[in-house]
Swiss-Prot record:
GO MF terms, alphabetically ordered: poly(A) binding; pre-mRNA binding; zinc ion binding
Protein name according to UniProt: Nuclear polyadenylated RNA-binding protein nab2
Lineage start: Eukaryota, Fungi, Dikarya, Ascomycota, Taphrinomycotina
Ranges annotated as biased composition (Polar residues): 105-129
Species whose genome carries this gene: Schizosaccharomyces pombe (strain 972 / ATCC 24843) (Fission yeast)
Family membership noted in the UniProt record: Belongs to the ZC3H14 family.
Region (Disordered): 102-135, 274-307
Compartment(s) of residence: Nucleus
Length: 307
């Protein structure tokens, strides 16, 4: 009873019905007030007998007790209509849910399959997998078959597994990672040709260059931007190749000092004379018989032992 009165719309309908019924009994002037009084008694949980007693005490003995019977019949009809509307709404929601679920399943079953990356036809979709997706039913059996086909497609031990496709994303991520290098504490005054830390741009004036980014500049030591804030190689790094070095020389400073490899292809500092290995100079070899004494042209002295 209380739930019905608290439901929006039903309490107003019951109030209007009570007011019309009281007007039929000849209490039209006080019908609105009596309807409010009846709703208060209903909200307090009064029974049919208790409502009759209250109205008889309020109106008098001429009160028609059939009103209470009509009142509870009206309440019963409103409750039935309310339950019917709730059931219809729940059925509509259930139908919408079932339709949505079936639509999602159909979309999943007819989804576009992944293409296989192959050297001979990189832009041609996998027609076999497309045919499998379209021929699979939408029931439980179809879902099991679809799951089985997906497992076979991504099974590394299967013959049709595309190894290059699974490896390429990881390699691509490794190549796209930015190289971060810490800043050299000597900045543009660094004298190490093989310094691995970041330095200011060589185009800036001495002491004015700044490194505000942990990325290395693509131009390297050839950077011409005075306001470049990326990292650069050491100012002592040799970037121009000596004339006697071949064009196949690798433009990276050699880590060995001095370098003793005559075929070394790395760059060596210009101030070092060990650009290429040279054998030590051969000195004139003299025999022991041709060696001279410490004092040349000295007279021989005879020492006679004393007796």
């Amino acid at each position: 009873m209380t739930t019905l009165l608290e439901t929006p719309g039903y309490s107003e309908k019951l109030h209007d019905s009570i007011e019309k019924k009281l007007s039929e009994y000849g209490w039209g002037e006080e019908a609105a007030s009596l309807a409010d009084f009846v709703l208060v008694m209903l909200s307090n949980g009064k029974t049919q007998t208790e409502i009759n007693e209250e109205l008889v005490d309020l109106i008098g003995s001429d009160f028609d007790t059939s009103f209470s019977l009509w009142l509870f019949n009206q309440i019963e009809e409103l409750e039935k209509s309310k339950n019917a509307s709730v059931e219809s709404v729940s059925k509509i929601d259930e139908i919408d849910f079932i339709e949505k679920e079936s639509t999602d399943k159909s979309q999943q079953s007819f989804s576009v399959p992944e293409t296989s990356i192959q050297p001979q036809s990189s832009q041609t979709p996998n027609i076999t997998s497309l045919r499998e997706e379209k021929e699979l039913p939408t029931g439980r059996v179809g879902q099991k078959l679809k799951l089985t086909s997906q497992k076979q497609r991504f099974n590394p031990m299967a013959a049709s597994f595309n190894y290059s496709k699974s490896v390429m994303p990881a390699a691509k991520r490794a190549l796209t990672q930015t190289q971060e290098v810490p800043l050299c504490k000597y900045a543009d005054k660094c004298s190490r040709a093989n310094c691995i830390f970041a330095h200011p741009t060589p185009a800036a004036a001495p002491g004015e260059g700044m490194v505000l980014s942990s990325e290395m500049c693509a131009s390297g030591k050839e950077c011409k931007a005075a306001d470049c804030v990326k990292g650069h190689p050491s100012p002592a790094t040799v970037t121009t190749l000596p004339p006697f070095m071949s064009m196949s020389t690798i433009p990276i400073p050699c880590k060995y000092k001095p370098c003793l490899n005559p075929a070394c292809r790395f760059i060596h500092p210009t101030k070092s004379r060990n650009m290429t290995w040279r054998p030590p100079s051969k000195t004139e070899e003299t025999s022991l018989s041709e060696r001279s004494f410490a004092v040349n042209e000295s007279e021989e002295q005879l020492h006679v032992p004393s007796v």
